[in-house]
């Protein structure tokens, strides 16, 4: 079975690459992002809109309310194996994402070492200036999405439920927005009414949080198992 894996740090264009590949091959894309399994976090987690999908199919490892918490890496890995098995007779699958814990689960599992032909695209982390430019553009889109709620509207809506607050405080983007509100002595709902200067500071701060996460991803990702640019068989990763 052919598996096309696209992985790398946040804000490096994985999703757009996966969509383009899906258009070329007709294969569905399976997201390897644990936060994207919660539709209530669609914008903040970077779920592409229907328009952005351009007619391609995107699958998720789960579809759960935030009250159930973020799916664990172990559960996500089990779901991943099941999805791959389900698509075995359909010609292949595109795997796309940047979950450190899930990719490390894959690296530690013997399941992936045989019976697959791997095509791997590893997106690299750009220099800080280039990354911040891309990340700020992404955050601006999250604040004013073409469809659905903004990241702040998602936050405000979910913050009303006290038991969801610890979960939100642990997720990039939402975490910094809450910190920004605290530092400026405002409530989360007041983030919807920022002036241009304050909004730019919020955008910069969220982008910096993404940079910190991207650097951690770059350090913690497992190494690709083969140096060949072309497809290969055998373990996809080496620890």
Curated annotation (Swiss-Prot):
Q: What is its EC number?
A: 2.5.1.27
Q: Does the keyword Transferase apply?
A: yes
**UniProt-listed InterPro entries:** P-loop_NTPase (IPR027417), Tzs (IPR002648)
One biological process term in Gene Ontology: cytokinin biosynthetic process
GO terms (molecular function) for this protein are: AMP dimethylallyltransferase activity
Instruction: Keywords in alphabetical order, please.
Output: Crown gall tumor, Cytokinin biosynthesis, Plasmid, Transferase
The record's disulfide annotation reads none
Q: Which Gene3D superfamilies match?
A: Crystal structure of tRNA isopentenylpyrophosphate transferase (bh2366) domain, P-loop containing nucleotide triphosphate hydrolases
Keyword Transferase, does the record have it?
Answer: yes
What reaction is this protein's catalytic activity? dimethylallyl diphosphate + AMP = N(6)-(dimethylallyl)adenosine 5'-phosphate + diphosphate
Identify the Pfam families for this entry: IPT (PF01745)
Which family is it part of?
Belongs to the isopentenyl transferase family.
Protein function:
Transfers dimethylallyl groups to AMP as part of the biosynthesis of cytokinin phytohormones.
Please identify the protein, giving its name as recorded: Adenylate dimethylallyltransferase
């Amino acid at each position: 079975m052919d598996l096309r894996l696209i992985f790398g740090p946040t804000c490096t264009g994985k999703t757009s690459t996966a969509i383009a590949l899906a258009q070329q091959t007709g294969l569905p894309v399976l997201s390897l992002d644990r936060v994207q399994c919660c539709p209530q976090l669609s914008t903040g987690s970077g779920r592409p809109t229907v328009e952005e999908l351009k007619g391609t199919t995107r699958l998720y490892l789960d579809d759960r309310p935030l009250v159930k918490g973020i799916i664990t890496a172990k559960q996500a890995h089990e779901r991943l194996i099941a999805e791959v098995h389900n698509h075995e007779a359909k010609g292949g699958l595109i795997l796309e994402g940047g979950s450190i814990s899930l990719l490390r689960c894959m690296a530690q599992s013997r399941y992936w070492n045989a019976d697959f032909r791997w095509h791997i695209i590893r997106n690299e982390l750009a220099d800080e200036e280039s990354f911040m430019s891309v990340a700020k553009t992404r955050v601006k889109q999250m604040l004013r999405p073409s469809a659905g709620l903004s990241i702040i509207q998602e936050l405000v809506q979910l913050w009303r439920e006290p038991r969801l607050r610890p979960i939100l405080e642990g997720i990039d983007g939402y975490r910094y927005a809450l910190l920004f509100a605290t530092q400026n002595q405002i409530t989360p709902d007041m983030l919807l009414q920022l002036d241009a200067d304050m909004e730019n500071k919020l955008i910069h701060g969220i982008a910096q949080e993404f940079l910190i996460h991207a650097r951690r991803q770059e350090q913690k990702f497992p190494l690709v198992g083969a140096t060949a640019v072309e497809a290969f068989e055998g373990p996809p990763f080496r620890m």
